[in-house]
UniProtKB/Swiss-Prot annotation:
It comes from Methylobacterium sp. (strain 4-46). Belongs to the acyl carrier protein (ACP) family. GO terms for biological process: lipid A biosynthetic process. GO terms for cellular component: cytosol; membrane. Residues 2-77 form the Carrier domain. This is Acyl carrier protein. The lineage of its organism: Bacteria, Pseudomonadati, Pseudomonadota, Alphaproteobacteria, Hyphomicrobiales. Carrier of the growing fatty acid chain in fatty acid biosynthesis. One of its GO terms (molecular function) is acyl binding.
Length: 78
């Protein structure tokens, strides 16, 4: 697992208060991890801060799963 994946999963566990075992790449933030729309906005903000990257609104809307976040950040973070 990549460093980015580890960091994304840590952020998800901290922000959503879920068990680390539930945070898989296929886990949907809302359907599987119990996030609401505010939680997803806060997650995007946390990803932006952690990875020093801006996630445009249109891209943020496509980040539905842990794997989506990892792929976006692997492609766009320095």
């Amino acid at each position: 697992m990549s460093d980015i994946a580890d960091r994304v999963k840590k952020i998800v566990v901290e922000h959503l208060g879920v068990e680390a075992e539930k945070v898989t790449e296929n886990a949907n933030f809302i359907d599987d991890l119990g996030a609401d729309s505010l939680d997803t906005v806060e997650l995007v903000m946390a990803f932006e801060e952690e990875f020093n990257v801006e996630i445009p609104d249109d891209a943020a809307e496509t980040i539905q799963t842990v794997g989506d976040a990892i792929k976006f950040l692997e492609k766009n973070s320095g």
